[in-house]
Structures are given as C-alpha cells and as structure tokens.
C-alpha cells in the first residue's frame, strides 16, 4: 500500500508561507518571462482562471478582482520541496519522489491505524490557520 503526498497549488502555497498577507487572495504564479499562469490559488481558480492562461488575457483582473501575479521563484519552490520531501521520508519505509510536489510513500510494514497515519500527514503538511503558517516548517 502507498500514500500519495501532493502539495496543493504548490507554487502559490509556497508564496503564501513567506507572505501571509497573500493567503486567501486570488494569486497566480507566472512562467518564465511572466508569460502565463503556471499555478493558481483557490481564489484565482474561483475567478475562472485556467492553467496556462496568458497573463495578457487575465491582467485585467488585477483591478477588477484584486488578482496578484507573481514571477516564479524556483529557488524558493525547490527549497520548500526539499523540506516537504524530508518530512515525507519519515512517514514510511520507502519514498519515491514523483515531482516537485508529489511523493509516494510505501506503507508496507507500517504499524498502527492507517487513518491515524493519514491524520499525522495532514497535520504535518497542512493548516488552514494563517497564524500557524505551515507548522512543519518552523
């Protein structure tokens, strides 16, 4: 059995860890040369912004809906990915990193109730309280 650890809206979420004022706001992270949206916050998705939307087509939402467009910060995302994968590695005996924000954790031989393990994973990687930011990165 395997667990999948997957960062939600990973690039956008990384930006909010160090800039908490962005949490809950419509936010897109833009590709190299700020050409198109490569990551979207939930609030940006609610505006109907599609993955890969060209910036010139959605820039009008800056004034009308408070959209924030940020240039990609790949060193930040790499650092946050390394932190996340280090935490994930301790959740089971094997780990297969699939992408910058996805990892499969082997659960063979893991003792205890898997539901409790799932709750531990959620606690490590997720909080909805802006004051806590991400408990796992202190």
Language-model region placement:
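Single conserved hydrophobic/aromatic residue that forms the stacking wall/gate
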Residues: 123-126, 133-138
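Gly/Gly-Pro- and Ser/Thr-rich, intrinsically disordered tail segments characteristic of DNA damage-repair
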Residues: 1-128
């Amino acid at each position: 059995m395997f667990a999948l650890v997957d960062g939600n809206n990973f690039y956008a979420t990384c930006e909010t860890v160090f800039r908490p004022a962005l949490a809950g706001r419509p936010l897109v992270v833009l590709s190299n040369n700020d050409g198109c949206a490569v990551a979207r916050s939930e609030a940006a998705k609610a505006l109907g912004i599609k993955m890969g939307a060209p910036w010139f087509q959605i820039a009008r939402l800056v004034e009308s809906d408070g959209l924030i467009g940020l240039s990609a910060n790949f060193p930040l995302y790499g650092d946050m990915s390394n932190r996340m994968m280090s935490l994930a590695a301790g959740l089971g005996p094997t780990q297969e990193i699939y992408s910058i924000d996805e990892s499969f954790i082997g659960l063979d031989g893991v003792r205890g109730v898997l539901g409790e393990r799932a709750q531990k994973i959620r606690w490590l990687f997720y909080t909805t309280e802006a004051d806590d930011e991400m408990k796992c990165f202190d």
